[in-house]
Each structure stands twice: as C-alpha cells, then as structure tokens.
Amino acid sequence: MGAAMVMVMPPYHGATFRFGEAQVHGFFQAVSDAIAIPIMVQDAPAAGTPLSPAFLARMAREIEQVCYFKMETSGAAGKLRELIALGGEAIEGPWDGEEAITLLADLQAGATGSMTGGGFADGIRPIIEAHRNGDPDTAFALYQRWLPLINHENRQAGFLAAKALMKAGGVIACD
C-alpha cells in the first residue's frame, strides 16, 4: 500500500517570492527522479510562480512522472485548453480545481476530473459523468443544484464546510 500519485506545487516562500522556470523544472525533475508514481502539478496562485501552458506542456514532455495538472488560476479553462493542445498525449490528467467553482467551463475545455475541497464528491462525480457521457443539460442541472454549496465552500467556509459535511456523513468523528 502507498500513494498512487502525489500533488506538488512549485517551491514557494510566500506569494511575492518567485522562482524561474529553470528552478521549477529542476525541482519537479528531482521529485520525479525520487518516485515512481505520477505527479500532479498544482497550479495555484498561492505559489506566486506563474506557470504558462507552454512551460507545463514542456515539463510533461520532459519529466517522466509529470502528467497530471490541477488548474486553480484565473482563466483556468483557457489555460487547460491551451495545455491540452500543446502537450497532447503527455497530458494524461488535466483537472479542474478550486472547489469546482469553474467546473463546467473546465470540463468544456477538456478537464477530465476535478479535485474539490473534499466535502461533496458524491455531488461532483455525477456532474463529471454526465458531461463525459455527452449530456451537458444534465451536467448543467446537477451543477446548478450543487452550486450554492460550491460557492459557500469556495468563498465562505473552505475546509470548515468540507469537515462539517464529512462529520455529518460519518467519514470523520470530529470537526
């Protein structure tokens, strides 16, 4: 037993301290050299290091384990679309992030999964499945049903909402 994948952000020391592409590439190369499982690059504003679609696609082609990407930046759908176009088969898993706030746009751009805060995977999965099965109307209707909770978790409560849902569902014992 063990991890099937790791999610890694570029090294950072606060949102104003940035690393160059060579340093970020070297960091991900070192992680890849040390493990034998896929790496998901988390492209999040907290890292402070901009990661262009061209650079991410290059890392996917050049670094063995780098093949999944979680987009949490503004303009995520456009970035996913460009990453998929530039990276081709090297992009195994382009994913939506940020609590699914842009899920439908990201799915339309080519995202194949989503990593939300974790509180309502049972609500997100049917949206993704409906989209994958070519039923955008059902995906939209399901998304609208879950959107108030998505917005609440994303903009108001964060992990507190996820923990409350997990406690209510019997996944964890405390909040």
Locations of regions flagged by a protein language model:
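Flexible glycine/acidic-rich beta-alpha junction loops that bind and position SAM and/or redox cofactors
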Residues: 16, 79, 164
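Catalytic alpha/beta core domains of metabolic enzymes, predominantly
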Residues: 45-157
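Short glycine-/small-residue-rich flexible loop motifs, especially phosphate/cofactor-binding loops
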Residues: 29, 103, 163
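Active-site beta->alpha loop and helix N-cap motifs at the rims of alpha/beta catalytic domains
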Residues: 1-48
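Flexible C-terminal active-site loop/helix
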Residues: 171-175
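Active-site pocket-lining/capping segments in soluble small-molecule metabolic enzymes
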Residues: 153-168
